[in-house]
Amino acid sequence: MGKVAVIYWSGTGNTEAMANAVAEGAKAAGAEVDLLTCADVKGVDGYDAVALGCPAMGSEELEDGEFQPMLETIEPALPGKKVALFGSYDWGTGEWLESWEARCAEKGIALAADSVKANNAPDDAALAACKALGAKIS
């Protein structure tokens, strides 16, 4: 098993709950896990896998004050790693996640697991999907 970084930004606690479930799934699969807010990230070079969590903000966009600048810093190091995405949204269909997946593809970042999204607070099914995501990238 490898070393996994679960990196997230959460405004209301919904994406944080998802991040905790991803970390729990990765640990249960035997991985060494660091659970980090985007403000704590110093790079991803020491990790085999990276799970990134961010809620939809504004008009279906990534949070641009802390998360997006951090993402732009680590993106060059993500190709070749196991990468997965997750997050929550309040309205619409979760289009921000589809845009984020397309952004990854444009930058040569292959996703190792299906992305997980939750409408507002994650329900039991979303939390189970987050645990499975964590296990899959471990």
Task: Give residue spans per PLM region.
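Aromatic-flanked redox-active Cys/Sec active sites in thiol-based oxidoreductases
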Residues: 8-12
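FMN-binding flavodoxin-like domain, especially the glycine-rich phosphate-binding loop
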Residues: 2-4, 14-17, 21-39, 46-138
